[in-house]
């Protein structure tokens, strides 16, 4: 079983440099997007009520801003 999976991996992925590069670039893009989204969500939750988007929404609700 393991040998068959290794052969498939080599035949379709590891054999050509272009597939390695495509996988590395795609993996980096997915990792960057995931980490950025998680960090931004965490930052927004820690600073809830202190960010301009929260202050502005409150001002609009009170009728102070447009």
Curated annotation (Swiss-Prot):
Residues 47-66 are mitochondrial intermembrane. Component of the ubiquinol-cytochrome c oxidoreductase, a multisubunit transmembrane complex that is part of the mitochondrial electron transport chain which drives oxidative phosphorylation. It comes from Dictyostelium discoideum. This is Probable cytochrome b-c1 complex subunit 9. The keyword Transport applies. Belongs to the UQCR10/QCR9 family. Its main location: mitochondrion. It is a single-pass membrane protein. It is found in: Mitochondrion inner membrane. The chain crosses the membrane at residues 21-46. Component of the ubiquinol-cytochrome c oxidoreductase (cytochrome b-c1 complex, complex III, CIII), a multisubunit enzyme composed of 3 respiratory subunits cytochrome b, cytochrome c1 and Rieske protein, 2 core protein subunits, and additional low-molecular weight protein subunits. The complex exists as an obligatory dimer and forms supercomplexes (SCs) in the inner mitochondrial membrane with cytochrome c oxidase (complex IV, CIV).
């Amino acid at each position: 079983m393991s040998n068959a999976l290794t052969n498939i991996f080599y035949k379709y992925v590891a054999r050509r440099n272009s597939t390695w590069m495509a996988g590395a670039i795609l993996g980096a893009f997915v990792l960057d997007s995931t980490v950025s989204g998680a960090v931004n969500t965490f930052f927004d939750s820690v600073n809830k009520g202190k960010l301009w988007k929260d202050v502005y929404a409150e001002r609009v609700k009170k009728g102070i801003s447009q």
